[in-house]
Amino acid sequence: MRVLLIACGATKLDHPAPASEIYTGSLTRAAIRHAIATGLPWYIVSAMHGLVDPAQVLEPYNVSIADLDRDYRPIWARQVAGRLALLHPACSVVEAHLGESYLRALRPFLPPVEDPLQGLGIGHRLRWYAERRS
């Protein structure tokens, strides 16, 4: 079973909203549209909240993985991976739509990871999503 993990984003609404709506940046919105279109289970990865269900209501916040102490990052990553394993014990592949810092922290604790956007800058990532919408 494949599960998609989507990066959170720095740009957010200024009021509480479901995780699927609170992030307003173009890259995060494109990744969410892609995840929905696949019909596969998907979650948002947040430095503050860990593995976030798209329906979970979040308050606006301003925390990224760069804000987490380096010694805490493996603990955070184990928590994210552990929650994923509880929710989807049959998950055999994670399709990661994450920034490099998040992926570097998480990869050792996840099932095999596919990174379809590896090496792509923001513009190329947006194009990748746009090509899959048409």
Pin down the residues of each PLM region.
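Peripheral peptide segments
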Residues: M1-S134
